[in-house]
Amino acid sequence: KGLHSFTQDEINELIVRNAFEYGNAVRLKGGDPFIFGRGSEEIDYIESFGIETEVVPGISSSMAVPASQGISLTKRGVSESFWVITGTTSERKLSTDVYLAAQSTATVVILMGMSKLNEIVSIFKKFNKSEIPTAIIQNGTTVSEKIGLGTINSIEEVVLQKQLSS
């Protein structure tokens, strides 16, 4: 929830120091480091020291978690595309992309949006999306996974009933 043990600068320096000291370093990152992560910042910093980098990609939670629940991000006759957006910007404000997404016919995956849920729901309602099926999945694909299913109209109540959080 935005609480980090190390600053990004400390992580960058740790990677470089270990690469020089041990001949290599591995940065194992939870989530996709190139979707609202700092993967490119780390690579740029490390390569500025002449250190070769390699990325071993995984599958983004924005696709894997819905799939694990049988939720299709695109479906013939329903949704031709999907958007992955942040709910909360680095300045802790609601992303303006939420307004655009609410007007789209695309499936919308909102990461880091729980603290802005009330605002997000209001925006989708404003664009007549009250009955859109909605899922909130906390700690997806882990043993502590919690799932709340509803519509834009009901999802805030579902969050309270299921005690979902970010």
Task: Walk through the language-model features, giving the residues of each.
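Class I S-adenosyl-L-methionine
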Residues: 1-56, 144, 156
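Active-site donor-binding loop signature of nucleotide-sugar glycosyltransferases
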Residues: 2, 86-87, 139
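A contiguous loop/helix-start segment that scaffolds small-molecule binding in enzyme catalytic cores
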Residues: 9-10, 20-26, 38, 81, ...
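Class I SAM-dependent methyltransferase SAM-binding "motif I" and its flanking Rossmann-like core
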Residues: 30, 34-104, 146-150
